[in-house]
């Protein structure tokens, strides 16, 4: 998509539209505006007892924005149950530009020096648009999601957009809403300015869980 850069991508998010590609080897980007959208209400996020235990034990070291490109690359790799990826070179270039401009963020899970999971997304106003996640070790992406929710709650976000819903996301409280409902929520979220860095760059699992359970 010639002439389509970071500024144009942000404008798409502000209109409720998001990009996707057919496959990794297809350089084209399509803009989607589905009839229904997936969200995780931040005050209704659910983490199972076993996941809370894993988070509290700090099985992984969790960081933010330490290796954005590696997280995107991890999300672009094929995995069991995800043989095809929609992340092509154009997507990687665009989101790297957004990251350099301070709008795209990553959450990384490390085991020693190895990146074993993480997620990335876009922050605009008080809305966070989750793009993709990956996991090479048990529960790594789930731990990253818990830490993301903690940051969004602490930073004053009001909308977590998951684009679509899956059974996996529904287990965390994700639900589907209509396009009109989504646009109303988005318009309200864009009025305010949230802070992705409201918490320190590295927090413990116990601190993340405390942030999630605090009354807003």
Swiss-Prot record:
Superkingdom assignment: Bacteria
The reaction(s) this protein catalyses: N-terminal L-lysyl-[protein] + L-leucyl-tRNA(Leu) = N-terminal L-leucyl-L-lysyl-[protein] + tRNA(Leu) + H(+); N-terminal L-arginyl-[protein] + L-leucyl-tRNA(Leu) = N-terminal L-leucyl-L-arginyl-[protein] + tRNA(Leu) + H(+); L-phenylalanyl-tRNA(Phe) + an N-terminal L-alpha-aminoacyl-[protein] = an N-terminal L-phenylalanyl-L-alpha-aminoacyl-[protein] + tRNA(Phe)
Any GO CC annotation of this UniProt entry: cytoplasm
Enzyme class, broadest EC rank: transferase
A GO MF label: leucyl-tRNA--protein transferase activity
Pfam families registered for this protein in UniProt: Leu_Phe_trans
InterPro entries registered for this protein in UniProt: Acyl_CoA_acyltransferase, Leu/Phe-tRNA_Trfase, Leu/Phe-tRNA_Trfase_C
Compartments (UniProt record): Cytoplasm
Enzyme Commission designation: 2.3.2.6
Any one GO BP annotation for this protein: protein catabolic process
NCBIfam families: aat (TIGR00667)
Functional description taken from the UniProt entry: Functions in the N-end rule pathway of protein degradation where it conjugates Leu, Phe and, less efficiently, Met from aminoacyl-tRNAs to the N-termini of proteins containing an N-terminal arginine or lysine.
Record-stated family: Belongs to the L/F-transferase family.
Protein name: Leucyl/phenylalanyl-tRNA--protein transferase
Natural source organism: Maricaulis maris (strain MCS10) (Caulobacter maris)
Lineage: Bacteria, Pseudomonadati, Pseudomonadota, Alphaproteobacteria, Maricaulales
Gene: aat
């Amino acid at each position: 998509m010639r002439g389509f850069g970071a500024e144009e991508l942000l404008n798409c998010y502000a209109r409720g539209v998001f990009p996707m590609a057919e496959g990794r080897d297809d350089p084209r980007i399509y803009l989607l505006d589905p009839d229904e959208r997936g969200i995780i209400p931040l005050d209704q996020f659910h983490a199972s007892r076993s996941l809370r235990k894993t988070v509290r034990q700090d099985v992984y070291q969790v960081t933010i924005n330490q290796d954005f490109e590696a997280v995107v690359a991890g999300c672009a790799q094929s995995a069991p149950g995800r043989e095809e990826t929609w992340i092509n070179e154009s997507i990687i270039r665009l989101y790297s530009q957004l990251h350099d401009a301070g709008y795209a963020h990553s959450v990384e899970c490390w085991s020693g020096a190895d990146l074993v999971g993480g997620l990335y997304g876009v922050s605009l106003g008080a809305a966070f648009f989750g793009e993709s996640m990956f996991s090479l070790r048990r529960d790594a992406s789930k731990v990253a999601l818990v830490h993301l929710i903690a940051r969004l709650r602490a930073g004053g976000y009001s909308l977590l957009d998951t684009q679509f819903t899956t059974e996996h996301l529904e287990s965390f409280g994700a639900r589907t809403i209509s396009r009109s409902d989504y646009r109303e929520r988005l318009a309200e979220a864009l009025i305010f300015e949230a802070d992705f860095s409201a918490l320190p760059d590295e927090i413990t699992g116990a601190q993340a869980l405390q942030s999630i359970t605090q009354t807003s």
